[in-house]
UniProtKB/Swiss-Prot annotation:
CDD domains: GT_MraY
Designated name of the protein: Phospho-N-acetylmuramoyl-pentapeptide-transferase
Cellular-component GO terms for this entry: plasma membrane
Gene behind this protein: mraY
Protein source organism: Anaplasma marginale (strain Florida)
Coiled-coil features, chain-numbered ranges: none
UniProt record, GO biological process: cell division; cell wall organization; peptidoglycan biosynthetic process; regulation of cell shape
Organism lineage: Bacteria, Pseudomonadati, Pseudomonadota, Alphaproteobacteria, Rickettsiales
């Protein structure tokens, strides 16, 4: 059914290997530097469970640099920097990383878990997403189309642009919400990235949609991201030595959402990232229900992983079960890919 990968896989493997090695090399010194800079000043919201407050305060954030730097360097070495697609992804990722980094910095300098206001953060996210999406709308022949579990593209017309905003900005914030327990967000990031990389490779191999995506840059980027995320997971797994922070979660979520838009696989991405979707829905449902009922709640705490934590489940149990769900969703996503590309 699928043609042999052949020599095209060589840059994928090299990108993955270099990024993994670089991640392991820079992680210890990066963690030490972040500890020295932040000096244990990593505020945690008081509404979270008491055990969470006790264990997480003092662990340095902004560890997303351990993922981003090796990924960017490896992509620059093995990718084609003359291709506009990779620049859209890298520029968007860096812009969201700067936004998240400023948010993280304000949190530990002000000793306030709020950081940038929600309104200002959302405005900045929409601004960055606008630049990327408007650029893509002028450079892609099929920008307003997508796969809705069909073998062909379906043109959504004017409705696609707001849909794309929801995908990119929603993905960014969903990953950010998920990054609340040791390793919880990292493995779903890895599995979702792998799915997008596979779709990117198949688009290259078969000359399939979307016609605006050319070359192996997206799978090379995804290979690098999987490698650096795996090395980060080594230090982020329970008991975590570092958190990716908003710097990592906002930028990685935006990158995944943007790639799904470029590859026209937003719905497959939603399946592979179902953990992110569940976390976002739980938070939105909690806020909406609380406003409608004047204070009543659906969950003990939102997002939902903190609900389970406050209900008495151990952190390791919550994370392991989330990882199981992520792996199952990975397999289901593969099945969807096979259906579309067979």
């Amino acid at each position: 059914m699928f043609s042999p990968i052949g020599k095209v896989a060589q840059p994928y493997f090299c990108s993955f290997l270099l990024s993994t090695i670089l991640g392991f090399v820079i992680a210890p010194r990066t963690i030490a530097a972040l500890k020295n800079i932040q000096k244990g000043r990593n505020p945690v919201r008081s509404c979270f469970p008491a055990a969470h407050l006790a264990k997480k305060s003092g662990i340095p954030s902004m560890g997303g640099v351990i993922i981003l730097l090796p990924c960017i360097l490896s992509t620059a070495i093995f990718g084609d920097l003359h291709d506009r697609d990779i620049w859209v992804i890298l520029t968007t990722m860096v812009a969201f990383a700067i936004l998240g980094g400023v948010d993280d910095y304000l949190k530990f300098t002000r000793q306030n878990p709020q950081g940038i206001s929600l309104e200002a953060k959302l405005f900045a996210q929409l601004l960055i997403a606008s630049a990327a999406l408007i650029f893509l709308s002028y450079t892609s022949d099929s920008f307003t189309s997508t796969h809705i579990f069909s073998k062909g593209l379906i043109d959504l017309g004017w409705a696609y642009m707001p849909f794309a905003y929801i995908v990119v900005v929603g993905s960014s914030n969903s990953v950010n919400l998920t990054d609340g327990l040791d390793g919880l967000a990292t493995l779903p990031i890895i599995t979702s990235t792998a799915i997008l990389g596979i779709i990117g490779h198949l688009s290259l191999q078969f000359g399939a949609e979307p016609p605006g995506v050319v070359g192996a840059n997206i799978p090379i980027f995804c290979s690098a991201l999987v490698g650096s995320a795996l090395s980060f997971l080594w230090f982020n797994a329970h008991p975590a030595q570092v958190f990716m922070g908003d710097l990592g979660s906002l930028s990685l979520g935006a990158s995944l959402g943007l790639m799904s838009v470029m590859l026209k696989c937003e719905f497959i991405y939603a399946i592979s990232g179902c953990i992110f979707v569940a976390e976002a829905i739980s938070s939105m449902a909690q806020v909406a229900y609380c406003k409608l009922t004047k204070g009543r709640k659906i969950f003990l705490v939102a997002p939902i992983h903190h609900h389970f934590e406050k209900a008495g489940l151990k952190e390791a149990t919550i994370v392991t079960r989330a990882w199981v769900i992520a792996m199952v969703s990975f397999v289901v996503s593969l099945a969807a890919i096979i259906y579309i590309y067979r």
